[in-house]
């Protein structure tokens, strides 16, 4: 079939657009880079504060160690390196990480942090998973989109909130105050068997409380709330 002059112009333009997109995607794949940075943070720290926009973070309890150990893994393309700032002020180690805005150049930053006991945590990520392992202390964890996984936790207060994502908790002691909230996702909390002041609710999902005693006068409180998802609070020996 012969094309009219206008049809040929449209066809050529479409081919040029497709070719440009293919070149951009191919170039992006070829230019992907990975960079790993590790460093210690020494001195008397009271707390850590991480504010990430795109990336996972894993916090590992370091027991009685004297320093914080940070490992940052960056992935990016077209040289669009994540912007990271860190500062120690008044006993607080603060880290902020932002990826440049781009439709084609994907960017992500992943952190692995080893932290001594009783250094408080304030961890926030816009898009990413938060993992806490073997930590003893007070922790606030939040992600807008991602899962929160907590294992081997023992501390005074735990506050974990996800906009969209599941929350799992395995505690090895009875924290005085535990708050678990998600807008969309399941909540599964495993606690030591005993008495707790429990508020376990789901607006759209099943609720299960087993192996623990719900007692309003108990010294330990547990709040597990999901807007859409199952909520399970259970005791283990």
Walk through the language-model features, giving the residues of each.
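Terminal targeting segments of Actinobacterial cell-envelope proteins
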Residues: 1-7
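Hydrophobic membrane-insertion alpha-helices, especially the h-region
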Residues: 7-26
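Short linear S-[DN]-x-LW-Φ motif typified by the pepsin-like aspartic protease active-site region
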Residues: 28-90, 110-114, 120, 132, ...
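Soluble periplasmic/extracytoplasmic beta-strand elements of cell-envelope proteins
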Residues: 47-51, 58, 94-96, 112-114, ...
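Structural motif
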Residues: 53, 89-90, 126, 135, ...
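Non-cytosolic head/periplasmic domains of membrane-anchored proteins
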Residues: 96-171, 175
């Amino acid at each position: 079939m012969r094309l009219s002059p206008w049809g040929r112009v449209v066809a050529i333009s479409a081919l040029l657009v497709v070719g440009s997109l293919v070149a951009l995607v191919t170039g992006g794949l070829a230019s992907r880079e990975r960079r790993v940075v590790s460093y210690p943070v020494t001195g008397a720290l009271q707390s850590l504060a991480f504010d990430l926009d795109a990336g996972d973070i894993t916090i590992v309890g370091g027991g009685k160690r004297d320093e914080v150990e940070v490992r940052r893994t960056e992935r990016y393309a077209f040289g669009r390196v994540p912007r990271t700032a860190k500062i120690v002020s008044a006993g607080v180690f603060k880290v902020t990480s932002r990826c440049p805005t781009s439709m084609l150049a994907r960017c992500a930053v992943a952190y692995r942090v080893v932290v001594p006991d009783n250094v408080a945590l304030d961890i926030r990520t816009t898009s990413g998973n938060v993992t806490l392992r073997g930590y003893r202390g007070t922790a606030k964890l939040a992600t807008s989109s991602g899962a929160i996984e907590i294992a081997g936790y023992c501390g005074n207060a735990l506050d974990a909130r996800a906009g969209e994502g599941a929350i799992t908790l395995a505690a090895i002691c009875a924290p005085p105050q535990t708050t678990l909230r998600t807008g969309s996702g399941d909540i599964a909390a495993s606690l030591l068997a005993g008495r707790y002041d429990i508020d376990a609710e789901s607006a759209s999902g099943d609720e299960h409380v087993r192996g623990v005693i719900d007692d309003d006068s108990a010294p330990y409180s547990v709040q597990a709330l999901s807007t859409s998802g199952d909520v399970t609070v259970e005791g283990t020996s």
